[in-house]
Amino acid sequence: MGLLVGDDLWAVVIFTAIFLLLVDLVHRRQRWTACYPPGPVPFPGLGNLLQVDFENIPYSFYKLQNRYGNVFSLQMAWKPVVVVNGLKAVRELLVTYGEDTSDRPLMPIYNHIGYGHKSKGVILAPYGPEWREQRRFSVSTLRDFGLGKKSLEQWVTEEAGHLCDAFTKEAEHPFNPSPLLSKAVSNVIASLIYARRFEYEDPFFNRMLKTLKESLGEDTGFVGEVLNAIPMLLHIPGLPDKAFPKLNSFIALVNKMLIEHDLTWDPAQPPRDLTDAFLAEVEKAKGNPESSFNDKNLRIVVIDLFMAGMVTTSTTLSWALLLMILHPDVQRRVHQEIDEVIGHVRHPEMADQARMPYTNAVIHEVQRFADIVPTNLPHMTSRDIKFQDFFIPKGTTLIPNLSSVLKDETVWEKPLRFYPEHFLDAQGHFVKHEAFMPFSAGRRSCLGEPLARMELFLFFTCLLQRFSFSVPDGQPRPSDYGIYTMPVTPEPYQLCAVAR
């Protein structure tokens, strides 16, 4: 009997191995066509997962681009992926072919946090009616609450004052500015979503931001890629909770805030914020099975907007201050322009931006150099397309490599160096390049771009108006190499702030 069990076991093993090999062959059959983009030979089962450095994906893609060209393919386990590089190809993919390439691939790892039917938020929602409904709502509601208007500018300016006060308290000794920058930017988002402002010492606020920071990278690294490629693994009891502990904790804190907010909502009163406006739409949509306005989707939309709006802008500001202490000559020129245009008494305004070409160029160069979302979020073809003489089938995951655009050697004079003159002409006037694409392009471009531009200019200019920043005495010069998470963050650093 024991021998029989052993034979049966080996039969199962052999059958399973053959089955997996056949599945693997089926998934890679498109690579056999002459018109499919070239790429490295995948291993059976794992594909190219072991051939990509998930701690430095931009560099991995750079090497593959040099070998295979601007359009190359990968096989992530059983998931076909095409990576697109360079300004011309990326813009063609996102803009010219936008109607066919704006879908999102399935990401099963998010199902455990509430993604599902009619609850896919905005950022990861498939390209279609639900996405259009939520994007239209988000853009119009943010405008209703001040986006692009003087009222929100005043709110940001007021928060910049609180940020400068917090910097003043730290000015006696070296400190890491990133936590304070996160608090300031988070308060702007919180004002739009929750109609509230947190004190910087608030324990709940600090716990939420700490948890969010610790969650970065949990869903974008090697483990997340494997689980998305082989979703059956997510059915292993307890695995999602163990793989994404901090992300789950952050979502629990967001749920707590939404429950508290819901208790104070009065449908008879005008909406106080985006959450109120969403709840009003939920009431209107009752009985409509086609609507994406429901309580589950409210949570996902709030998480989308909070994470996207806070993390990217605060990270960019952290890069900005790092680059100021590494390039004191650039900082001096920014100080000079601020003194000439704004002075030391009044607060900076968005109207000043047009008269401050150098400061504007510095902010743009920070975004280009920092390159905080190098591979963008993945897209997916919604139908077969012929692109750059290649055939890409429906359902193929697409990675528009924004890093290859922001560091394109054919566009930028010094692509790997921090060089604000990239955005200035010979007369010192500001010039915006077509290859400046930190917010992506096309239908899936960042809906919060106007808010981010406002925050970057006002926070950066207010800080440089009030302080001079330097590397602390006795400390080594910080590195300008980033840590690859999503987004790419600077290595932890400290600075000294001296009042001007």
UniProtKB/Swiss-Prot annotation:
Domain of life (superkingdom): Eukaryota
Offer a single GO CC term for the protein.
endoplasmic reticulum membrane
Any one Pfam family here would be p450
Q: Which cofactor does it need?
A: heme
List the molecular function annotations (GO) for this entry.
heme binding; iron ion binding; oxidoreductase activity, acting on paired donors, with incorporation or reduction of molecular oxygen, reduced flavin or flavoprotein as one donor, and incorporation of one atom of oxygen
Kindly summarize what the UniProt induction comment says about this protein's expression.
P450 can be induced to high levels in liver and other tissues by various foreign compounds, including drugs, pesticides, and carcinogens.
Chief location:
endoplasmic reticulum
Q: Does the keyword Glycoprotein apply?
A: no
Q: Which residues carry this modification: Phosphoserine?
A: S249
Q: What membrane topology is annotated for this entry?
A: Peripheral membrane protein
> What's its EC?
1.14.14.1
The answer to whether keyword Membrane applies is: yes
Q: Can you state which reaction this protein catalyses?
A: an organic molecule + reduced [NADPH--hemoprotein reductase] + O2 = an alcohol + oxidized [NADPH--hemoprotein reductase] + H2O + H(+)
Q: Which CDD domains match?
A: CYP2D
Residues binding heme are: C446
The record's subcellular locations are: Endoplasmic reticulum membrane; Microsome membrane
Which keywords are on file for this protein?
A: Endoplasmic reticulum, Heme, Iron, Membrane, Metal-binding, Microsome, Monooxygenase, Oxidoreductase, Phosphoprotein
Instruction: Give the family this protein belongs to, as stated in its UniProt record.
Output: Belongs to the cytochrome P450 family.
> What is the name attached to this protein's record?
Cytochrome P450 2D26
* Organism listed in the record: Mus musculus
